[in-house]
Amino acid sequence: MAAHKKSHIRIFFVSVMIILSLFSGFGEGQTYINYNGMKGDIIPGCSSKNPKECVKIPAYSYNRGCEISTRCQRQQHSSSS
């Protein structure tokens, strides 16, 4: 009786492994990057008909600000030759 029960368990596990191996191939992705994936940085509306939309605004424009030591006054550097 124990040998008969072990054979049922063995058949069950083999059938589960076969089913899982069949389903494992369905989720595979593409093996290459297509051109649609590389177009993510294109600005919509940027074309030769509308060139002003192609200009990107810088993310950080440097501003030195006010220094306490100069009391917010810029010193004029004279160039002596």
UniProtKB/Swiss-Prot annotation:
Cleavable signal peptide: 1-29
* Presence of keyword Protease: no
Record-level Gene Ontology MF annotations: hormone activity
What GO terms fall under cellular component here?
A: apoplast
Chief subcellular location equals secreted
Q: Which GO terms describe its biological process?
A: calcium-mediated signaling; cell-cell signaling; regulation of growth
Q: Which InterPro entries does the protein's record reference?
A: RALF
Family under the similarity heading: Belongs to the plant rapid alkalinization factor (RALF) family.
Question: Disulfide connectivity?
Answer: C46-C54, C66-C72
Which keywords appear in this protein's UniProt record, sorted alphabetically? Disulfide bond, Hormone, Secreted, Signal
Q: Please report the name of this protein according to its UniProt entry.
A: Protein RALF-like 6
Localization, per the record, is: Secreted
Function recorded in the entry: Cell signaling peptide that may regulate plant stress, growth, and development. Mediates a rapid alkalinization of extracellular space by mediating a transient increase in the cytoplasmic Ca(2+) concentration leading to a calcium-dependent signaling events through a cell surface receptor and a concomitant activation of some intracellular mitogen-activated protein kinases.
- What is the organism field in this record? Arabidopsis thaliana (Mouse-ear cress)
